[in-house]
């Protein structure tokens, strides 16, 4: 098992400092979120969690190796509060969960040199902790510390439904990549709910959390439509089949709580698990560890797999580092006598 991490990629020496219009002069300390776009561009969500003003910002890098150097970004914008979570909406839209209680939609404009606001809706009563876009791309889900979950119509810029199915703060929502009306949520009430917005009573409780520890992170399996994973406050990761939720595969991965779970784009996906123990682990389909890194010196907050190089995993953290890890992949099997190579 490999545990070493290569040094971050170094921006080319010939690159010139060129801060785009409307971008903040300085990036805040805490890197909260990172998402690759399909073309390999990198989006960062950043917060300032110290000082008199808790502000945040969004940064778009066409060259991910330049992040987090603000002078080499392609576009950037200040937000009025910290960024708790974000996700792409297509190739131009950016959906943001704000510490202010707002759900925000931003969009790249002017040849991707500006990030402009499309809407900002204050309909939650506390920090919006998590957002996800349903597979249709036209609707989104937000979860908040006000214990509420909201469904959004992105084109109409309105919330369609508001649900108080949880009795505790909502920590994660995760849209199914297979069905455009299905998503998961978990909360500090210890419950994981499976949602189908087509149903009169859309939420059903999953009986998969026998440990009693609070679930803290969720992710759908990208290829198996009935399978998801969740992490808990004790550092364990569990694999669940929604058709037989009482039978789960679990592994003690971290010494502290799991904060994020991200699947890779491989045909047999790897799973990245992030934790409050400041480490990241990459797990195979049996939840066995294939890679671990402790390169971050503070909480590691998000991870995103490169769509162009499937062995490249990028993480960000409160130590203001963007680290590009090369994850060892299993070697391809030798071609058999019946194999044909074109």
Swiss-Prot record:
Key words of the record = Cytoplasm, Nucleus, Phosphoprotein, Repeat, Ubl conjugation pathway, WD repeat
Location of this chain's protein in the cell: Nucleus; Cytoplasm
Q: Which GO terms describe its molecular function?
A: methyl-CpG binding; transcription coactivator activity; ubiquitin-like ligase-substrate adaptor activity
Q: Which Gene3D superfamilies match?
A: YVTN repeat-like/Quinoprotein amine dehydrogenase (2.130.10.10)
InterPro entries in the record = Methylosome_Comp_WDR77 (IPR052139), WD40/YVTN_repeat-like_dom_sf (IPR015943), WD40_repeat_CS (IPR019775), WD40_repeat_dom_sf (IPR036322), WD40_rpt (IPR001680)
Question: Which SUPFAM superfamilies does the entry link to?
Answer: WD40 repeat-like
Q: Report the function annotation for this chain.
A: Non-catalytic component of the methylosome complex, composed of PRMT5, WDR77 and CLNS1A, which modifies specific arginines to dimethylarginines in several spliceosomal Sm proteins and histones. This modification targets Sm proteins to the survival of motor neurons (SMN) complex for assembly into small nuclear ribonucleoprotein core particles. Might play a role in transcription regulation. Substrate-recognition component of the DCX(WDR77) complex, which mediates ubiquitination and degradation of Irgm1 in intestinal cells.
Q: What is this protein called?
A: Methylosome protein WDR77
Q: Which organism is it from?
A: Mus musculus
